[in-house]
């Protein structure tokens, strides 16, 4: 599907009707990646933006620098001047700002509803799936940017090449990560949808029924217009099963022989992946991808499939793949450091589902086979740890050394037997490795100092505050002497 592009920002703003009676938009939980991205785009469109969160971070600081009003803490008076309030699913009904908005009859909308409003009059490209959404969104954005098409994008993580997770572009293209965690992606009505994979996650949203989750993805694909396109990973067994139920044009990608956009001859050399993309009726592309792992080759193939259908030049695709810097906390190479006992490499990764952890381990093994793999893992949510307990144990026992933090609760109450200590006990009983439970992340540097060896690859893994642990270790430069003093 070829679309007409324009570079005139004033023309685009004229094309996209404003929310006429809305002047001031308030975001509760503005520090989150998904919320901050929408806030930044709306701020650049000229709306008055305010928002609140429990703590300041780099995202809230950046928004404040751009002119947003940021409140630390949730108070009723924060919404006093708002025309509309945007909330994330992490915010409960007892929040004083929600209660104040209801009393004042200020409209309250979910994050996805506001994203849908941004997408309504644009050429929307939505990226959905259990894993790989953020990286795929970044790769699509990189291709369209390399082609000179200046897209608007809203991503769930930092696009390193842009230095932000969202930006208002001058064309009518909007590339957005679509979140299935609360089924709110059903508000979106894109022109093109990528689905990377479908696995059992966020099952509380779907009543514990995987069939319900699958049907929700089908419903989401049917939000496409009849002339829209579904770009689907045929390697995923659930997607392959669902394709006959999709009544829109389907373009498949993957390593599978019957994929419309097929990956061949994948090989990894350290941080880079190299492979050939075979496209029906088009020249093959010999890709050098500047991020590692077969899973990222799949993410790249999805982006290439979209770009190919939109007649983007092959040269732009090749440049985007070679130049991509990846996304924040996705196999994020933080450096190689002289430890005082040799040299060690530090990588940080956001993956928090067993499948994500597994592909990250494989990428580390394939690129640095000679290194001892030391993982610092933080489980995310008690419910996920409970529901995928055996899968976590199976994946985590693949590393050479495992330091286990306790569960990052994300607002959940503890569940007996679904915690870091229990997971350690289960893995230890299997006899492959002897994990070390570290109940206090503040003591982790000193624990790591006692086991670090020359040539180690230290991989911090998880969606909670383990990313802060990674940055702390990087600031200490993995120096054994400095870590022992913590």
Swiss-Prot record:
Keywords on record: ATP-binding, Cell cycle, Cell division, Cell shape, Cell wall biogenesis/degradation, Cytoplasm, Ligase, Nucleotide-binding, Peptidoglycan synthesis
GO aspect biological process, one term: regulation of cell shape
Pathways per UniProt: Cell wall biogenesis; peptidoglycan biosynthesis
Catalytic activity reported: UDP-N-acetyl-alpha-D-muramate + L-alanine + ATP = UDP-N-acetyl-alpha-D-muramoyl-L-alanine + ADP + phosphate + H(+)
Enzymatic class: ligase
SUPFAM superfamilies: MurCD N-terminal domain, MurD-like peptide ligases, catalytic domain, MurD-like peptide ligases, peptide-binding domain
An annotated Gene Ontology molecular function: ATP binding
Superkingdom of source: Bacteria
EC code(s) of this entry: 6.3.2.8
Record localization: Cytoplasm
Residues the record lists as binding ATP: 129-135
One GO location term (cellular component): cytoplasm
Family: Belongs to the MurCDEF family.
NCBIfam families noted in UniProt: murC
Function comment: Cell wall formation.
Protein name according to UniProt: UDP-N-acetylmuramate--L-alanine ligase
Organism, scientific name: Vibrio cholerae serotype O1 (strain ATCC 39541 / Classical Ogawa 395 / O395)
Gene name tied to this protein: murC
């Amino acid at each position: 599907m070829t679309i007409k592009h324009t570079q005139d920002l004033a023309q685009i703003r004229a094309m996209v009707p404003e929310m006429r009676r809305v002047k001031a938009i308030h975001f509760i939980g503005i520090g989150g990646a998904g919320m901050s991205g929408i806030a930044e785009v709306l701020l650049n469109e000229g709306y008055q933006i305010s928002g609140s969160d429990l703590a300041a971070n780099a995202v809230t600081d950046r928004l404040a620098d751009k002119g947003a009003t940021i409140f630390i803490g949730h108070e009723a008076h924060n919404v006093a001047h708002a025309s509309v309030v945007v909330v994330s699913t992490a915010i409960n009904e007892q929040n004083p700002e929600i209660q104040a908005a209801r009393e004042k009859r200020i409209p309250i909308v979910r994050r996805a509803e506001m994203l849908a409003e941004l997408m309504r009059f644009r050429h929307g490209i939505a990226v959905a799936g259990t894993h790989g959404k953020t990286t795929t969104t970044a790769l699509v954005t990189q291709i369209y940017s390399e082609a000179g098409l200046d897209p608007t994008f809203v991503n769930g993580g930092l696009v390193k090449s842009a230095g932000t997770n969202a930006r208002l572009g001058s064309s009518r293209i909007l590339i957005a990560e679509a979140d299935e965690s609360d089924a709110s992606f059903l508000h979106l009505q894109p022109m093109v949808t990528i689905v990377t994979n479908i696995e059992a996650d966020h099952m509380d949203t779907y009543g514990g029924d995987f069939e319900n989750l699958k049907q929700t993805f089908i419903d989401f694909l049917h939000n496409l217009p009849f002339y829209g396109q579904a770009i689907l990973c045929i390697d995923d067994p659930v997607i392959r099963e669902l394709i006959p139920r999709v009544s829109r044009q389907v373009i498949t990608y993957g390593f599978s022989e019957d994929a419309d956009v097929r990956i061949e001859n994948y090989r990894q050399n350290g941080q880079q992946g190299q492979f050939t993309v075979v496209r029906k009726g088009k020249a093959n592309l010999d890709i050098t991808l500047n991020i590692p792992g077969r899973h990222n080759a799949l993410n790249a193939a999805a982006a290439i499939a979209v770009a190919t259908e939109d007649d983007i030049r092959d040269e732009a695709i090749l440049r985007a793949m070679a130049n991509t810097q990846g996304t924040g906390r996705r196999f994020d190479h933080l450096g190689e450091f002289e430890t005082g006992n040799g040299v060690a490499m530090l990588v940080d990764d956001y993956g928090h589902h067993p499948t994500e952890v597994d592909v990250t381990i494989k990428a580390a093994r394939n690129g640095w086979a000679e290194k001892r793999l030391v993982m610092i893992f933080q489980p995310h949510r008690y419910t996920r740890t409970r529901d995928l307990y055996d899968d976590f144990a199976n994946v985590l026992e693949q590393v050479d050394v495992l330091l286990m933090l306790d569960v990052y609760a994300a607002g959940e109450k503890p569940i007996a037997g679904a915690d870091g200590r229990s997971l350690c006990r289960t893995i230890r009983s299997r006899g492959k490795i002897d994990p070390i439970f570290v109940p206090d992340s503040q003591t982790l540097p000193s624990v790591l100092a006692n086991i670090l060896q020359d040539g180690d690859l230290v991989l911090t893994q998880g969606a909670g505050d383990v990313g802060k642990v990674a940055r702390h270790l990087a600031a200490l430069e993995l120096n054994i002497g400095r870590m022992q003093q913590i």
